[in-house]
Every structure is written in structure tokens, then in C-alpha cells.
């Protein structure tokens, strides 16, 4: 059976449980990601860091905070923070309402594709197939 070329799912933000690991169900091979809901006063039980993986933390709903190398940083809704591998981190909720985060992680490639400076360097444009977008 051939692997799917794409995978689609729907996760209503208000239905997110404590932690929803989505990488495997989505068939991801190079990106790890999850949705996390912390109730007031909840958060990671310990700090951690990585050898090579960087992470991106996005506050989707509510206001929480992240501790980076011992410094607490507020994360109101819409905040996006990239954290390098060696930084100790812990995510939590010190507010009075639930907070929902998206967490993404990836290991850098040994070499960026096609000599580019980003992973987008392996993009193959087809300018003959331009999608039409309709106003609603």
C-alpha cells in the first residue's frame, strides 16, 4: 500500500484534551507536533532540552508562560517562540483560564536542500498551474 500524499484532520480547539500527539496520526516523517491544553496552575512537570531538535511554541488560545533557561516569559494568545536545542524549557499556565498551545519540533537536516538557506529550498514551482481564489 502506497503512503498517502497528504493527510487532513480536524481538531476543534475547544475539544483539545490535555495533550494531543498528532505527528504519527498525520503520517509526519520529519516534523513532530502536538496540541496541549493546560488548566490554570498546570504545566510541564520538569524542564528539558534537546541535543539537536529545535522547537516552536505557539499560543493558540488563552495566556500562559514558558520558562527558558530559568527565565519566565509571558505567552499571550498569538505568541510564537522558537527555542534552540540546548535551552532548558518548560511550558505552563499561570493564568486563571485554560491555555492551548501548538508545539512543533524538527531536527535540522545535515545539509539544506539544493544549496538553499532554508528547507524551502527544495520547492519545485509550477507557474503554469496557478490556483484561482474566489472572494466569498
Model-derived segments and their meaning:
Residues 27, 65, 85-111:
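Ligand-binding loop in jelly-roll beta-barrel domains
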Residues 30, 51-52:
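Short, small/polar residue-rich loop motifs at catalytic or cofactor-binding pockets
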Residues 1-31, 116-136:
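A short, N-terminal "cap"/entry segment at the start of jelly-roll beta-barrel domains
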Residues 70-86:
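Short acidic-glycine-tyrosine-enriched beta hairpin
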Residues 35-36, 79, 89:
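Hydrophobic/aromatic beta-strand elements that line small-molecule binding cavities or substrate pockets
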Residues 19-21, 34-50:
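Conserved short histidine dyad/triad with adjacent acidic residue
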Residues 52-54, 58-64, 69:
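Glycine- and acidic-residue-biased ligand/ion/polar-headgroup-sensing regions
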Amino acid at each position: 500500500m502506497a503512503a498517502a500524499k497528504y493527510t487532513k484532520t480536524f481538531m476543534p480547539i475547544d475539544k483539545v484534551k490535555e495533550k494531543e500527539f498528532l505527528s504519527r496520526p498525520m503520517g509526519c516523517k520529519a516534523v513532530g507536533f502536538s496540541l496541549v491544553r493546560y488548566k490554570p496552575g498546570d504545566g510541564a512537570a520538569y524542564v528539558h532540552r534537546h541535543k539537536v531538535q529545535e522547537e516552536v511554541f505557539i499560543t493558540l488560545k488563552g495566556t500562559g508562560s514558558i520558562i527558558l533557561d530559568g527565565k519566565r516569559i509571558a505567552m499571550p494568545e498569538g505568541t510564537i517562540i522558537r527555542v534552540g536545542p540546548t535551552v532548558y524549557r518548560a511550558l505552563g499556565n499561570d493564568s486563571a483560564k485554560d491555555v492551548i498551545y501548538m508545539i512543533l519540533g524538527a531536527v535540522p537536516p545535515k545539509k539544506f536542500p539544493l544549496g538553499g538557506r532554508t528547507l524551502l529550498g527544495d520547492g519545485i514551482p509550477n507557474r503554469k498551474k496557478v490556483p484561482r481564489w474566489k472572494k466569498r
